[in-house]
Amino acid sequence: MSNQSQVMRTHGKTFFWASWFLEREVSNRLYAIYAFCRRIDDLVDESNDEVELSKNFYDVINAWENNEYHHAFEEFKGIPRNYLPREEIIKEFLKGQASDLNHHQPKNINELLIYCYRVAGVVGLMVCDSMEIKDKKLKYFAIDLGIAMQLTNICRDIKEDAERGRIYLPINIIKGLTTENILRPTKQQLIDINQARDRLLNRADLYYESGYQGIEHLPKKTARSLKIAAQLYQAIGKKMIKSKKTYLDGRIYLNKLEKSLISMQIVLRRNNINATKIHNHLLHDSIRKLPDSHNKCCLLYTSPSPRDS
């Protein structure tokens, strides 16, 4: 087993499970992307302050621009440059990671979605780059899938994040509750936070359903693997709601039987090659100015806005 795949097996069990359904060449590129993201995450953890982190990230970008060695790119060795992430996408990812060092709770859903784009939506774009996908619409859907998965992560890790002094639930949704409130809530606060969690999970479903439209237009094996990963993540969110457990009851996981059933359903299902490629531009209202986002209105789509009232 390669070092890259071992990193994913250890830290990203859902993705590792789904990767078994990919062709070896494609899975190796995705392992490399995942390992790169983990290395950047380690750089954040190793930095003592914003000044040191800025220097570390400058070194990363400088090495990339000048095609020089940097240990962050160790896993990219042997992969042709045309399959690697673009510089502007790497920069957006670094911005997202840097925001975790000097964490500020998002004021509203718009700020949260920008964060989700930078730490996960751009990973969808990295995957597009690794497959040489040029279709702009497919990139819209890739962003949506990344955002959906990050929203699921946030909802699953409410307690763990609070223990680290971080809150990703927007201020205007949880009415200014603190980490202390989250870790030791009153009965009403517990209800309010669980309702906020479920509200975000329902929003994540909008992004999942959009992402699935793009998956249908990918090569069969790639589509199958990505759909398995996405549906496993989405199933975690649905299990959170259905179980009636609170965020204090511990992280929700899927067992092997649940993973197997979902995977087999997808393997046995045919791709819907006639799936629409009309993207709901309203999903990108908050990120419209960021790379590869949908920044023009699509008049053919008349779905109601997903924005909070």
Give the ranges of each region predicted by the language model.
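An N-terminal structural lobe/cap that precedes and organizes the functional/catalytic core
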Residues: Q6-E52
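Active-site alpha-helical segments that house and flank conserved acidic catalytic motifs
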Residues: N28-E46, K139-I167
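N-terminal, motif-rich segments that launch catalysis or mediate targeting to/interaction with membranes
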Residues: L43-K107, L113
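Divalent-cation-assisted or electrostatically stabilized phosphate/pyrophosphate-binding catalytic cores
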Residues: V51-N62, R166-R203, L254
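Helix-hairpin-helix/helix-loop-helix acidic hairpins
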Residues: P106-F141
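Glycine/small-residue-rich hydrophobic helix-like segments
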Residues: Q188-K239
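Acidic, carboxylate-rich catalytic segments that either coordinate divalent cations
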Residues: S260-L300
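Single conserved hydrophobic/aromatic residue that forms the stacking wall/gate
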Residues: Y301-S309
